[in-house]
């Protein structure tokens, strides 16, 4: 997530060129992009509040894990993350999220999940003017509301309660 801090004119190969000066504070980087090329290189405005709300709703949905090879899915996830589309990034976060009671992720799954979560939290924090930590908390709260995760947690609580009753009767 970068911020345009100015527009400057530079002489390049004898031509005068207007450039956006984009600062990436978290990455400690400054980028200069020719004004006419801004959209073709992927620069865009921040998402609006409606898009953020839809992204958080997407995260609450049921994960869609395709049964294709991991390398193919990883490429698709990477493409969604790099697209910059907040809804597509939310889909990656939803699909790769693992709660405490689920099996662990592979290293590459974890890397993709963290990249998607980072991009999503940066955008939400900028749009809602909150900290990235608060944005991550919002995302994780919505992930916990997912039908699969909520039902599984309730089911496990019911099993534990039944086990406790069985142990009490045996004693």
Description of each model-found segment:
Residues 44-171:
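Charge/polar-rich, low-complexity and marginally structured segments
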Residues 1-43:
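A positional/architectural concept
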């Amino acid at each position: 997530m970068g911020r345009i801090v100015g527009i400057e004119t530079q002489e390049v190969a004898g031509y005068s060129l207007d450039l956006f000066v984009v600062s990436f504070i978290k990455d400690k980087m400054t980028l200069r992009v020719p004004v006419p090329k801004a959209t073709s290189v992927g620069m865009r405005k921040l998402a609006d509040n409606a898009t953020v709300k839809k992204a958080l709703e997407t995260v609450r949905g049921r994960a869609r894990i395709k049964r294709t090879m991991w390398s193919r899915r990883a490429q698709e996830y990477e493409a969604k993350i790099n697209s910059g589309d907040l809804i597509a990034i939310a889909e990656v976060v939803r699909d790769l999220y693992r709660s405490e009671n689920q099996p662990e992720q592979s290293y590459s799954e974890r890397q993709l999940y963290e990249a998607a979560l980072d991009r999503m939290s940066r955008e939400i924090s900028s749009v809602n003017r909150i900290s990235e930590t608060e944005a991550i908390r919002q995302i994780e709260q919505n992930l916990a509301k997912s039908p699969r995760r909520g039902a599984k947690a309730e089911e496990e609580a019911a099993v534990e309660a039944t086990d406790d009753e069985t142990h009490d009767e045996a004693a």
